[in-house]
Amino acid sequence: MGVKTLFNGARFVGQAEGDRRKYYVFDAASGYLVAAPQAPHSYSVTVIQRDAPEVISNKFRGTQITVSTLKAKGHRPDLFDRYFDRLNALYVMVALGKARKLKKRLGKAMLFKISSAK
């Protein structure tokens, strides 16, 4: 996947509220694009593979998880190896309405409740 085709067909699907900023999620041919504001008029973009939300839904349906849970129990290093890939995959879940970020925490870790609906 090259930068020239990264944004082909991208359409906005939703947003997720993080601790410090909002994350904007787009569905594109290359996967889900998560855009996070970095400075005025500047965004960073992370690509999340298309099958990540389905894997999370199937594995963790109806449970509360943290970013670390994805690494320990996700069993998909191709999807969940790096910390920010795991975090952004959870933000994609929130934007798609398949999860919600809880106000409570597990220690310092953010908790996400994965929807029990298919």
Where on the chain are the PLM-derived regions?
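Short amphipathic alpha-helical interface segments
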Residues: 1-81
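Generic structural signal for short, flexible, solvent-exposed coil/loop and linker residues
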Residues: 2, 54, 87-88, 101
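Generic low-polarity alpha-helical segments
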Residues: 70, 89, 100, 117-118
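Short amphipathic alpha-helical interaction segments
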Residues: 78-96
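A short, conserved structural fragment
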Residues: 94-107
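Short, cationic-aromatic polyanion-contact patches
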Residues: 104-118
